[in-house]
Amino acid sequence: MEYEIIRRKETGYSVSVAASKVTSFRKNFNETTTVRAYENGCIGIAGAVGKANLSALKKEAAESLKKGIAYPCNLSGGVRHDPAPKEILPESGIVPAFRALLEELSKKADGYLFGNKINLSYETVSYENTAGASYTSHDASLEYALTIKDKKSANIMDMVYGKRAFSYKKDAVVSEVLEMIAAYENPVPMPAEKLPVVTDAGAVAPLLSHFVAEMYGSGASLLSGKMGQKVFGDRVSVLVDRNPPYTGRFFDAEGVVNPEGKFYLVKDGVFCGALATKRSAQLFSLPVSGTAGSTYDGVPGATFTGLRFENTAEGYAAAGDAIFVVYASGGDM
């Protein structure tokens, strides 16, 4: 019988903001342990929240093999333990730092109200298996999700400042928010000519589901049957990148580590890969993409973690005139 053991610890801080003021501060700590047992082409899973009894979880996972859930084992070895990142902000300094940020934003953009949340998290994940693998990764990040409301507007909000950062730089945040507000205050007519559109990959998330192996293999994807064909323009490359800053974890939930941390779905316009776990890869004769994720007590499934478009220009200025989509939502999406 073969085993996988995954341990995850996360400390999270959440600062709530309303009317440009810090209104609450919350801290939480989550710890989970997952054990997967493999035998005779089946998987058994056991998970625990909080401190775990590893022997009991192994026994429970072995017992759950009786459910007969088919899943390939295909374990591989390897050792890598990344060092922990530097602390972004000390716990005692989180609220003062964001109060100072909001005070400066209120002074420099006094016609606007800021709200919603700023989150800070530290995560450590370890993976080991009976084939000799032993991995540890750490992630420390700030998530800004600030709504911006024009005081003269009847809207609930008029803009959103969203950003994932790995260090706290107040001046940079203020500069970026003011740049966004300056653009909002300077409406221009939509150009008649065709221009590149610059946006976050999240804006096209519904299209990304067509890369999932189950959709591709079942014939439900727009890409079904087109593996190896050129279906996009020459400059389009889409890849899973598990290197910082795209994701802090170099391995996925199945312990897969891609060469150089990358796996291409589209390379120079050619469709060359799908988002495949070990099970879907075996089912549809596809390469494993290294993008598996799972709940602490669930079967692995494909995720979009680390998915990005490869840069075609060194910075926005090099791309020339373009339409920049900062935020989009609603039924028309």
What are the residue ranges of the model-derived segments?
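Active-site bordering "gate/hinge" segments
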Residues: 1-251, 258-261, 267-270
